[in-house]
Amino acid sequence: MAFPQTRPRRLRATHALRGLVRETHLSPSDFVYPMFVAHGVDCRKPIAEMPGVDHLSIAHAVEEAGEAAALGIPAVLLFGLPATKDEEGSGAWDEEGIVQLASRAIKDAHPDLLVITDLCLCEYTSHGHCGVVTPEGVVDNDATLELLARTAVSQAHGGADIIAPSDMMDGRVGAIRAALDEEGLAGTPIMSYSAKFASAFYGPFRVAADSAPAFGDRRAYQMDPANGNEAVRECKLDIDEGADIVMVKPALAYLDLIRRIKDETEVPLAAYNVSGEYSMVKVAAAAGYIDERAVVLETLTGIRRAGADIVITYHAKDAATWLQ
Protein backbone atom coordinates (compact mmCIF):
# COMPACT_ATOMS: atom_id res chain seq x y z
CA MET A 1 0.00 0.00 0.00
CA ALA A 2 0.99 3.61 -0.50
CA PHE A 3 -0.18 7.00 0.71
CA PRO A 4 -2.82 7.79 1.94
CA GLN A 5 -3.34 4.30 3.43
CA THR A 6 0.30 4.13 4.53
CA ARG A 7 1.40 7.01 6.74
CA PRO A 8 4.76 6.44 8.48
CA ARG A 9 4.16 9.56 10.58
CA ARG A 10 1.51 7.67 12.59
CA LEU A 11 4.27 5.89 14.50
CA ARG A 12 6.17 9.14 15.12
CA ALA A 13 3.31 11.02 16.72
CA THR A 14 4.28 10.73 20.41
CA HIS A 15 7.32 10.01 22.55
CA ALA A 16 5.75 6.73 23.69
CA LEU A 17 5.04 5.58 20.14
CA ARG A 18 8.55 6.44 18.97
CA GLY A 19 10.00 4.49 21.88
CA LEU A 20 7.75 1.50 21.23
CA VAL A 21 8.97 1.04 17.64
CA ARG A 22 12.60 2.15 18.13
CA GLU A 23 14.93 -0.22 16.32
CA THR A 24 18.23 0.65 18.00
CA HIS A 25 18.67 1.11 21.72
CA LEU A 26 21.60 2.77 23.45
CA SER A 27 22.63 1.81 26.98
CA PRO A 28 25.60 2.45 29.28
CA SER A 29 26.18 -1.30 29.10
CA ASP A 30 27.25 -0.82 25.46
CA PHE A 31 30.17 1.44 26.38
CA VAL A 32 33.86 1.06 27.12
CA TYR A 33 35.50 4.10 28.75
CA PRO A 34 39.14 4.80 27.73
CA MET A 35 41.53 6.30 30.31
CA PHE A 36 45.13 7.55 30.20
CA VAL A 37 47.12 6.50 33.27
CA ALA A 38 50.43 8.04 34.28
CA HIS A 39 52.96 7.86 37.11
CA GLY A 40 52.73 10.42 39.87
CA VAL A 41 50.91 11.16 43.10
CA ASP A 42 47.56 12.93 43.08
CA CYS A 43 48.03 13.82 39.41
CA ARG A 44 45.11 14.86 37.24
CA LYS A 45 46.36 16.80 34.23
CA PRO A 46 43.87 18.04 31.61
CA ILE A 47 44.66 17.18 27.99
CA ALA A 48 44.16 20.40 26.03
CA GLU A 49 43.55 18.60 22.74
CA MET A 50 40.80 16.45 24.30
CA PRO A 51 38.59 18.72 26.45
CA GLY A 52 37.22 16.83 29.44
CA VAL A 53 39.87 14.08 29.30
CA ASP A 54 42.80 13.97 31.75
CA HIS A 55 46.04 12.17 32.40
CA LEU A 56 45.36 10.30 35.64
CA SER A 57 47.62 9.00 38.37
CA ILE A 58 46.61 5.59 39.65
CA ALA A 59 44.52 6.87 42.56
CA HIS A 60 42.56 9.14 40.24
CA ALA A 61 42.20 6.33 37.69
CA VAL A 62 40.67 4.15 40.40
CA GLU A 63 38.27 6.97 41.28
CA GLU A 64 37.36 7.58 37.63
CA ALA A 65 36.82 3.87 37.05
CA GLY A 66 34.49 3.76 40.04
CA GLU A 67 32.44 6.63 38.63
CA ALA A 68 32.14 4.80 35.32
CA ALA A 69 31.04 1.60 37.06
CA ALA A 70 28.44 3.49 39.11
CA LEU A 71 26.94 4.76 35.84
CA GLY A 72 26.53 1.22 34.53
CA ILE A 73 29.56 1.24 32.22
CA PRO A 74 30.95 -2.31 32.30
CA ALA A 75 34.55 -1.75 31.18
CA VAL A 76 37.47 0.65 31.01
CA LEU A 77 40.29 0.63 28.45
CA LEU A 78 43.71 1.60 29.80
CA PHE A 79 46.49 3.43 27.97
CA GLY A 80 49.75 3.90 29.83
CA LEU A 81 52.25 6.76 29.86
CA PRO A 82 55.54 5.30 31.11
CA ALA A 83 58.10 7.31 33.04
CA THR A 84 60.85 6.33 30.57
CA LYS A 85 61.07 4.96 27.03
CA ASP A 86 63.62 2.92 25.11
CA GLU A 87 64.18 1.47 21.63
CA GLU A 88 62.39 -1.81 22.39
CA GLY A 89 59.58 -0.41 24.50
CA SER A 90 60.50 -2.60 27.46
CA GLY A 91 58.22 -0.68 29.80
CA ALA A 92 55.28 -2.37 28.10
CA TRP A 93 56.03 -5.74 29.72
CA ASP A 94 57.42 -4.44 33.02
CA GLU A 95 55.56 -6.21 35.84
CA GLU A 96 55.60 -2.88 37.69
CA GLY A 97 54.67 -0.88 34.59
CA ILE A 98 52.03 1.79 34.71
CA VAL A 99 49.29 -0.27 33.04
CA GLN A 100 50.00 -3.29 35.21
CA LEU A 101 49.92 -1.20 38.40
CA ALA A 102 46.75 0.60 37.36
CA SER A 103 45.04 -2.66 36.40
CA ARG A 104 45.74 -4.20 39.79
CA ALA A 105 44.56 -1.12 41.64
CA ILE A 106 41.33 -0.84 39.66
CA LYS A 107 40.54 -4.56 40.01
CA ASP A 108 41.22 -4.42 43.74
CA ALA A 109 38.84 -1.48 44.16
CA HIS A 110 36.21 -2.50 41.60
CA PRO A 111 36.40 -6.26 41.08
CA ASP A 112 33.28 -6.43 38.91
CA LEU A 113 34.50 -3.78 36.45
CA LEU A 114 36.22 -5.18 33.37
CA VAL A 115 39.73 -3.88 32.74
CA ILE A 116 40.79 -3.93 29.10
CA THR A 117 44.43 -3.12 28.39
CA ASP A 118 45.55 -1.62 25.11
CA LEU A 119 48.50 -3.63 23.83
CA CYS A 120 50.93 -1.70 21.66
CA LEU A 121 54.55 -0.63 21.96
CA CYS A 122 54.22 2.90 20.53
CA GLU A 123 53.68 4.55 23.93
CA TYR A 124 56.82 2.84 25.26
CA THR A 125 59.30 3.12 22.38
CA SER A 126 61.62 6.09 22.06
CA HIS A 127 60.87 6.26 18.32
CA GLY A 128 57.09 6.08 18.68
CA HIS A 129 56.55 3.19 16.27
CA CYS A 130 54.50 0.14 17.16
CA GLY A 131 57.29 -2.42 17.04
CA VAL A 132 60.96 -3.21 16.61
CA VAL A 133 62.61 -0.87 14.09
CA THR A 134 65.41 -2.16 11.87
CA PRO A 135 68.52 -0.09 11.03
CA GLU A 136 66.77 0.68 7.73
CA GLY A 137 63.87 2.27 9.58
CA VAL A 138 61.36 -0.52 8.89
CA VAL A 139 59.13 -2.02 11.58
CA ASP A 140 60.13 -5.69 11.84
CA ASN A 141 56.85 -7.56 12.00
CA ASP A 142 58.05 -10.96 13.20
CA ALA A 143 60.53 -9.63 15.75
CA THR A 144 57.74 -7.52 17.22
CA LEU A 145 55.43 -10.51 17.78
CA GLU A 146 57.58 -11.90 20.60
CA LEU A 147 57.47 -8.57 22.44
CA LEU A 148 53.71 -8.25 22.00
CA ALA A 149 53.20 -11.76 23.35
CA ARG A 150 55.42 -11.00 26.33
CA THR A 151 53.47 -7.81 27.02
CA ALA A 152 50.13 -9.60 26.78
CA VAL A 153 51.19 -12.12 29.41
CA SER A 154 52.46 -9.34 31.69
CA GLN A 155 49.21 -7.41 31.33
CA ALA A 156 47.08 -10.47 32.02
CA HIS A 157 49.11 -11.35 35.11
CA GLY A 158 48.76 -7.69 36.12
CA GLY A 159 44.99 -7.95 36.28
CA ALA A 160 43.72 -7.30 32.75
CA ASP A 161 40.45 -9.06 31.97
CA ILE A 162 40.76 -8.53 28.21
CA ILE A 163 43.86 -7.91 26.07
CA ALA A 164 43.39 -5.49 23.17
CA PRO A 165 46.26 -5.51 20.64
CA SER A 166 46.30 -2.35 18.52
CA ASP A 167 49.68 -2.62 16.77
CA MET A 168 48.50 -4.06 13.41
CA MET A 169 51.36 -6.55 13.06
CA ASP A 170 50.51 -9.60 10.95
CA GLY A 171 50.05 -12.71 13.09
CA ARG A 172 49.89 -10.86 16.41
CA VAL A 173 46.61 -12.43 17.56
CA GLY A 174 47.92 -15.95 17.05
CA ALA A 175 51.17 -15.15 18.84
CA ILE A 176 49.35 -13.55 21.76
CA ARG A 177 46.83 -16.38 22.01
CA ALA A 178 49.58 -18.99 22.08
CA ALA A 179 51.54 -17.10 24.74
CA LEU A 180 48.51 -16.63 26.97
CA ASP A 181 47.55 -20.28 26.65
CA GLU A 182 51.08 -21.43 27.49
CA GLU A 183 50.96 -19.32 30.66
CA GLY A 184 47.70 -20.90 31.83
CA LEU A 185 45.70 -17.86 30.71
CA ALA A 186 43.47 -19.61 28.20
CA GLY A 187 40.44 -17.86 29.70
CA THR A 188 41.73 -14.36 28.89
CA PRO A 189 39.88 -12.96 25.84
CA ILE A 190 41.47 -10.97 23.04
CA MET A 191 39.73 -7.91 21.61
CA SER A 192 41.72 -7.19 18.47
CA TYR A 193 41.92 -3.83 16.74
CA SER A 194 41.44 -5.84 13.55
CA ALA A 195 40.47 -3.09 11.10
CA LYS A 196 42.58 -0.18 12.32
CA PHE A 197 43.03 2.45 9.68
CA ALA A 198 45.89 4.92 9.19
CA SER A 199 43.55 7.74 10.07
CA ALA A 200 43.90 11.50 10.43
CA PHE A 201 41.37 11.30 13.28
CA TYR A 202 44.01 10.05 15.75
CA GLY A 203 45.73 13.42 16.15
CA PRO A 204 44.55 14.36 19.67
CA PHE A 205 45.24 10.83 20.97
CA ARG A 206 48.84 10.89 19.82
CA VAL A 207 49.39 14.05 21.83
CA ALA A 208 47.57 12.57 24.83
CA ALA A 209 49.51 9.30 24.72
CA ASP A 210 52.81 10.90 23.64
CA SER A 211 52.95 8.27 20.90
CA ALA A 212 53.51 10.14 17.63
CA PRO A 213 56.22 8.48 15.51
CA ALA A 214 59.55 10.29 15.57
CA PHE A 215 60.01 9.63 11.85
CA GLY A 216 57.81 8.51 8.98
CA ASP A 217 54.26 7.36 9.58
CA ARG A 218 52.31 4.15 10.23
CA ARG A 219 50.90 3.57 6.77
CA ALA A 220 53.12 0.51 6.24
CA TYR A 221 51.20 -1.38 8.93
CA GLN A 222 47.90 0.42 9.61
CA MET A 223 45.26 0.09 6.91
CA ASP A 224 44.58 2.29 3.89
CA PRO A 225 41.33 4.22 4.55
CA ALA A 226 40.25 3.47 0.97
CA ASN A 227 40.08 -0.31 1.49
CA GLY A 228 36.93 -2.13 2.57
CA ASN A 229 37.49 -5.71 1.44
CA GLU A 230 40.82 -5.72 3.24
CA ALA A 231 39.09 -4.72 6.49
CA VAL A 232 36.79 -7.73 6.27
CA ARG A 233 39.77 -9.96 5.51
CA GLU A 234 41.73 -8.61 8.49
CA CYS A 235 38.82 -9.38 10.81
CA LYS A 236 38.44 -12.91 9.48
CA LEU A 237 42.18 -13.55 9.80
CA ASP A 238 42.13 -12.38 13.42
CA ILE A 239 39.14 -14.57 14.20
CA ASP A 240 40.96 -17.56 12.70
CA GLU A 241 43.95 -16.75 14.96
CA GLY A 242 41.79 -16.65 18.09
CA ALA A 243 40.31 -13.16 18.44
CA ASP A 244 37.20 -13.21 20.62
CA ILE A 245 36.12 -9.67 19.67
CA VAL A 246 37.10 -7.67 16.58
CA MET A 247 37.13 -3.90 16.19
CA VAL A 248 36.82 -1.16 13.61
CA LYS A 249 38.78 2.04 14.33
CA PRO A 250 37.83 4.85 13.74
CA ALA A 251 34.05 4.57 13.74
CA LEU A 252 32.31 7.45 12.00
CA ALA A 253 34.09 7.44 8.64
CA TYR A 254 33.83 3.62 8.57
CA LEU A 255 30.18 2.92 9.42
CA ASP A 256 29.81 1.00 6.15
CA LEU A 257 32.54 -1.38 7.28
CA ILE A 258 31.01 -1.83 10.71
CA ARG A 259 27.88 -3.02 8.92
CA ARG A 260 29.77 -5.28 6.51
CA ILE A 261 31.89 -6.87 9.21
CA LYS A 262 28.87 -7.42 11.43
CA ASP A 263 27.10 -9.15 8.55
CA GLU A 264 30.10 -11.27 7.54
CA THR A 265 31.44 -12.42 10.93
CA GLU A 266 29.97 -14.11 13.98
CA VAL A 267 31.94 -12.65 16.89
CA PRO A 268 31.13 -9.50 18.90
CA LEU A 269 32.13 -6.30 17.12
CA ALA A 270 33.56 -3.19 18.78
CA ALA A 271 33.90 0.26 17.23
CA TYR A 272 36.20 2.99 18.52
CA ASN A 273 34.78 6.53 18.56
CA VAL A 274 38.26 8.04 18.43
CA SER A 275 39.89 11.18 19.79
CA GLY A 276 39.46 13.33 16.69
CA GLU A 277 35.77 12.46 16.48
CA TYR A 278 35.40 13.27 20.18
CA SER A 279 37.31 16.55 20.11
CA MET A 280 35.42 17.90 17.09
CA VAL A 281 32.17 17.54 19.02
CA LYS A 282 33.61 19.10 22.19
CA VAL A 283 35.07 22.10 20.37
CA ALA A 284 31.94 22.71 18.29
CA ALA A 285 29.75 22.43 21.39
CA ALA A 286 31.95 24.84 23.34
CA ALA A 287 31.61 27.35 20.49
CA GLY A 288 27.83 27.02 20.61
CA TYR A 289 27.57 25.53 17.13
CA ILE A 290 25.89 22.27 18.19
CA ASP A 291 23.95 20.74 21.07
CA GLU A 292 26.56 18.44 22.65
CA ARG A 293 24.13 16.05 24.31
CA ALA A 294 21.99 15.60 21.19
CA VAL A 295 24.98 15.17 18.89
CA VAL A 296 26.76 12.68 21.17
CA LEU A 297 23.70 10.48 21.61
CA GLU A 298 22.94 10.61 17.88
CA THR A 299 26.54 9.70 17.08
CA LEU A 300 26.66 6.75 19.46
CA THR A 301 23.25 5.53 18.30
CA GLY A 302 24.49 5.66 14.71
CA ILE A 303 27.51 3.52 15.59
CA ARG A 304 25.25 0.99 17.29
CA ARG A 305 22.75 1.05 14.41
CA ALA A 306 25.57 0.32 11.96
CA GLY A 307 26.20 -2.93 13.84
CA ALA A 308 28.62 -2.32 16.70
CA ASP A 309 27.94 -4.40 19.81
CA ILE A 310 30.49 -2.41 21.84
CA VAL A 311 31.26 1.30 21.54
CA ILE A 312 34.57 2.58 22.91
CA THR A 313 34.11 6.29 23.53
CA TYR A 314 35.50 9.17 25.57
CA HIS A 315 31.88 10.36 25.79
CA ALA A 316 30.98 7.26 27.83
CA LYS A 317 30.47 8.91 31.22
CA ASP A 318 28.54 11.85 29.83
CA ALA A 319 26.39 9.64 27.62
CA ALA A 320 25.69 7.24 30.48
CA THR A 321 24.63 10.17 32.67
CA TRP A 322 22.28 11.47 29.97
CA LEU A 323 20.78 8.01 29.50
CA GLN A 324 19.90 7.57 33.18
Language-model features and meaning:
Residues 1-22:
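N-terminal amphipathic/basic leader segments beginning at the initiator methionine
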Residues 2-3, 14, 26-32, 38-324:
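Alpha/beta enzyme core
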